[in-house]
Amino acid sequence: MKRPLLFVTLVASLMFFATPVNAQSFGVRAGASANPDQFFFGGHYETRPLMEHLTFRPNIEVGFGDDVTLVAFNIEFAYWIDLKNKPWKVYLGGGPAANLYDSDSETDLQGGFNLMVGAQHRGGLFGEFKVGLIDSPDVKFTVGYAFK
């Protein structure tokens, strides 16, 4: 791993330890993406609602495979939809992404945008599907756990 990639990854990971006092939760995630074809893992934190049903849910995902390492810094918002009398909530959202691609020949920072839909159980388990635009991975399938 090259020094710039290691430095950016280290600095970005510090944001998870400096969560604001009003942070509602944080979580872990893992999954698979297409184009590049990778397995990834990461983490997120989520604020209390900024307005009714809308939260800020930034995350970092580190992917390996397809002869490239990808560190994705996703600045995403989620709009939550309550399912009456059900233990699950559905969310829709998206936001911009800064994608750091590192291959044998070069390191490149590219902008992207994600659209997502997901469902989260009140116990914390969640599943998420993302579609990437511009220079984000084409699709991502994610499972994870949000700690409360």
Range-by-range predicted roles:
Residues 25-29, 55-59, 89-93, 126-128, ...:
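Residue-level detector of the transmembrane beta-barrel scaffold of outer-membrane proteins
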Residues 27, 40-44, 74-76, 91, ...:
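Membrane-embedded beta-strand positions in outer-membrane beta-barrel channels/transporters
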Residues 42-104, 147-148:
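Gram-negative (and chloroplast) outer-membrane scaffold detector with strong preference
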Residues 17-23:
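Sec/Tat signal peptide C-region and signal peptidase I cleavage site
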Residues 8-16:
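Bacterial N-terminal signal peptides
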